[in-house]
């Protein structure tokens, strides 16, 4: 698996089930850029495990970290922010065809009002 390229990151801070998305670009030199802001960081991969860390606070170890499993066109895992927030995420490589089953009946636990994220992908309050 080679993560280099454009990915769409879907993230959810907390167990709300409301995922928000943003583009993320992984460079061949072990860096990445969060396209919705001037944030960047570094990434590393070993076999099917991937880890990336934002460099929001370059002089500090307290930066948001994403870790998870990675396949050719999909990856998912957990994230931890510098403020102590926890969440889950998944990313799909740009250009990947994704199919899903649409439910005919809206199940009560899936009905939820649209909300704006309280935290952005790097864990900063919005």
Q: Across the structure, where does each feature detected by a protein language model lie?
A:
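Tryptophan-anchored aromatic micro-motifs
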Residues: 1-19, 35-37, 45, 77-79, ...
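N-terminal glycine/threonine-rich, aromatic-flanked beta-hairpin/loop signature
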Residues: 13-51, 57
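A structural detector for short beta-strand units
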Residues: 20-24, 38-41, 62-67, 86-89
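A short, structured loop/turn motif at beta-sheet edges
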Residues: 44-48, 69-74
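An anionic, turn-rich surface loop/hairpin at beta-sheet edges
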Residues: 52-70
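Short beta-strand-to-coil "C-cap" segments at the C-terminal boundary of structured domains/repeats
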Residues: 69-70, 90-100
